[in-house]
Amino acid sequence: MKDGGESKEQQLTVALRIRPINETELAEGATIIAHKVDKQMVVLMDPMEDSDDILRANRSREKSYMFDVAFDYTATQDTVYRFTTKGLIEGVISGYNATVFAYGPTGCGKTYTMLGTDWEPGIYIRTLNDLFKAIEETSDDMEYEVLMSYMEIYNEMIRDLLNPSLGYLDLREDSKGVIQVAGITEVSTINAKEIMQLLMKGNRQRTQEPTAANKTSSRSHAILQVTVRQKSRVKNITQEVRVGRLFMIDLAGSERASQTQNRGLRMKEGAHINRSLLALGNCINALSERGSNKYVNYRDSKLTRLLKDSLGGNSRTVMIAHISPASTSFEESRNTLTYADRAKNIKTRVKRNLLNVSYHIAQYTSIISDLRKEIQRLKKKIDEQGLKQIRSEKSDIRNIQAEVQLHSSTYGRHEMEQLKEQLIRAFREQMDIRRQLMEIENSSMEMQMETSRHFLITAEWEQEKTRRARKWRDEHRKETYGKDDSEKDSDTGDDQSDFIEPPEVITARETIQILEGDQNKLRRQKLELEKRFRDVRHHARRLEEALPKRISSDDQREILSLLCKVHELEIENTEMQSHALLKDNMIRQKDYMVQRFEQHRSLCDEIIQQQRRIIYDHNLTVPHQLNDLYELYFRELEEGVLDKAAVLALKDSQSCLPKIPNLTAEENLQEPDSDQESVRTFGSDNRNPIHRDSYKNLLPQILSETDSDTNKVFKTSPRARHLKNGAVVTPPPIHVNGIISKEYLPRNQINYFPDSTDSKVVLTHREKKEITTSIQSIAVKAARRRSRVLEGDRLQPMKERSNLSVHSMSESEDTVFTDQRFPSSSLHHAASEDNLSSTTGEIVAVHGGGSNHRDSPNLWHRTQKKQAQKLEKREESLEVKRRKKRSRSFEVTGQGLVRPKNHISRNRALESNSDHKIQSNTLQTNRKIMLPIAQVKLPQNQTTTVFKMAEQQEGKHQTNQPGSVKKLISTNQPPRFNYINANASGIYVKDVRVRKY
């Protein structure tokens, strides 16, 4: 090594950088206490300043510090680099040593300053770029060799970041006092891209762990060493080699365990970090004392041993101190400023590193060959310059323009490719971040729904526990009531029994805690991604703004603008997907709410049916207001108001209504179907169990208000629906007293389930004949019933004209009453062949005593057979007489009564979804067709053919029932109209109301 001449004294350069305050510090209520006054002065405010302190009343608590350069939160990475490190590159190439290190507490931005990000590179990358640019500028006269090594000091152990498989390395010192790391990997490169790739590879191997103070805290000191060897291209017997070293160090931050909340390995790492930084601080204190020969202990730490030349030896050193402006970090900021202020007094002696190489005689031949190669290179260069001069003399303006255009197009194409790559990289990064945000949002929504579900479980348990506690207190109060004081004192120890939580509640609470922790993690990840996205978007916008300045061709501008538009469309597509995902989650939550409300509505239907059954079973008096509410309830069920919204909302989900229970043969005996066709044989529900199960489990179809029969609480049997829609043909309009009853369109035959067997019912010839015969007599019986209602109104006073049951209007020969209670059945249609043939004065007597008919089902079956035989004989005689005496003006085709088109029948008995049957004490007649009666308004003074025919039929078929009244209709009485409203649920006296107008 040759002496590089006299050494020059160099003062250590100290810069200060104040990072911006973060959201965590603002959330803690911190204020800004560090301020940059000018380019060199920084003021630190004391947040604990007390105006009431008498001893320090006139003393300022502010501390001001002067540095070589100061930066606040507005300074960019390029500004920090230009004022601190850029001036060291020329000295490194010339053979001088240089050192740049970042110092400060944890979480203050040291790694950001040294390493930076992809779109805001730090000092590492900027220094290496400028270093290779300087090498290229002087490569014509000088030869260069660049070596790079990258290491970290982790827990006082040195590890190679470029080759981690080497393990921990030793620190050695040679005879000349130069510190060397034994076995470190030195990579030789002359390309900036290669050295960048090596740098990124080493950064991925560096130890980083999150702490409470910093989520990406560096747990080691990283040291990047770049060695540059420079020698002349002109060979000689002796040659001079200049060796310059550049150290760039990212120190780990000093930390307090109370702030970082470290435990275990993290605390051990923090102890080693603080130990090495303390040794560095002691070295700074010893070196900063002027005029003292105090011993500087570099051997306390491996960090100070590596920085020996940088601090007190042959090096130009720059120290960049970092502090936080928050008041919560006042102590750490003050200590950092104190050490940085002392470091200004450190001076180093800088000299150039020169190596004199003397070649042996055996190497002379190689020197001669190298000199010849250099001569050839220089001649070739001279020839190229001569050709350029000749071309320039002979060329005209056109050739010059063509050459300029060629160079400009080549440069423009290269510039465009670079911009294109940068734009595409920025766009892809934005898309990746957006997709990650969308995935995090989706996961967060799913966790919220899962948390809500578990909260419902715990809330239900809390309500149940409160109910049990209240019940226990009531029972305890009843037990202790009446006891003497001694017994009460003995019972005070057992105040309330402990309720053990079910396993599902315990699991729900544990799951809620886990989900809340996961949600907090997702929230933090979302904040980080949003911050990254803002930075990337800002970088992309700057590139888009630079397009018009850096590109001159219109075609290239158009291509890049189209590229930007494509990216904008991709971003909009991603945003639409995100919005669709959010809406899907909202719809899922609403479906869950609708399902819960549907379950609640089903429970309310069950309660209503049970209450109504209890009222009818015990013959309780129903208030008028409650009866109106029942009518409104059943009307809404008929019209589908309550069910239509639920069907629309739950058409793609499973039905939450209670299932219809499976009935055995005995249960069918006790609760026959609401339609008379279903009572024909016992246990008819068990004929096709597959059909019944599918009928229960499948969801109802979406129908109109008039056709939605399956959505109602009560519904007709499949047999009755088939007979009503298939066998009965709509007759022509019937003129009654000038009032035309409009034709009622039959309901559409809709098969609700794919395995339904309703369409397979085949009627025999005898059944069709019986149906036709029974339907033809309905009009006559209806007219006869209305005439007797009018006669009853004439004879009875107003107060006795109470609501009459439709089922009380049955003839004595059709119904046999005994003291035995018949099996309860569901609600009947208001208009049937049985309840249309009675007189108006009949009232059904309900006997509470007697044996239960459920014990003797055979007796009930025999009674029905006898009744069926009587009905057949009576209908045959009635049909013969009716054909002889009826008027031709009232011609019925035998297809049944017509109904108004706009009439919605409320008089049909329906099967319940929530409650299987509503009990009734009325006996059903076998094998009859039941049709609802529309409201018919008839004047009492009209003696039409209908009433005459009814009177003739009355004379032939007298009844012996008590309460039937026979009286001629007066023809000179003023007209008076009666409206008979038959309710579908009206199986008792108070369900049919006769209103006079």
From Swiss-Prot:
Instruction: Give the main localization category.
Output: cytoplasm
One Pfam family, short name: Kinesin
Give the organism, scientific name.
Answer: Xenopus laevis (African clawed frog)
Q: Give binding positions for ATP.
A: G104, P105, T106, G107, C108, G109, K110, T111
Q: Please name the gene that encodes this protein.
A: kif19
Span-the-membrane segments of this chain are none
Query: What is the protein's name according to its record?
Result: Kinesin-like protein KIF19
Q: Which UniProt keywords apply?
A: ATP-binding, Cell projection, Cilium, Coiled coil, Cytoplasm, Cytoskeleton, Microtubule, Motor protein, Nucleotide-binding
> Bias category Basic and acidic residues: which stretches?
468-491, 792-802, 869-880
A GO biological process of this protein is:
plus-end specific microtubule depolymerization
Show the GO MF annotations.
Answer: ATP binding; microtubule binding; plus-end-directed microtubule motor activity
